[in-house]
Amino acid sequence: MGWLEVNVSCPNVHGGGMSFGTQPEAAAEVTRAVKAVTTKPVIIKLSPNVTDIVSIARACEDAGADGISLINTMLGMRVNLRTRKPVIANTMGGFSGPAIFPVALRMVYQVSKAVKVPVIGMGGVSSAEDVIEMMLAGATAVEVGAANLVNPFASRDIVRSLPETMEKYGIQILSDIIGGAH
């Protein structure tokens, strides 16, 4: 693998899984610790469950992150109507899918304007149009997550539909549109 993506934002882990990514100094400390033990590029994956994602991204960049990926899942919860108990063993856990795309897009836009390192956009991406929107918002690359759980061929289908979608919107080269919405 050519790089390491360090998830400082997992809401599904007891005992600090998300807490590393909710405070700028804690995220920076993790970034420095990982950078100290590898020569590979380090990408820090951020949580949307914060008040100011820009300050956290900047702290990671200042600590040596080679890139920022965002967003991880949003904190969510469901209750079983029969048992009246939380469905998720941890009570709360990661909520993902198309519903979080607008939040992810906003955060990619904000962070990409604030940092100089590459930004990888993710969160609710399920179509070639979503990829183009992410790139217009400032993502230099895009990841697909939850869509692959619904359709194991989602990533392949998105890549295959990109040329037609690019033509539809008059896009010759994807890299030319990065940050085009700024």
Regions found by a protein language model. Give the residues of each.
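Hydrophobic alpha-helix feature that most strongly marks membrane-spanning transmembrane helices
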Residues: K116, L136-A139, P163, E167, ...
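A short, charged, Gly/Pro-tolerant segment at domain boundaries
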Residues: S175-H182
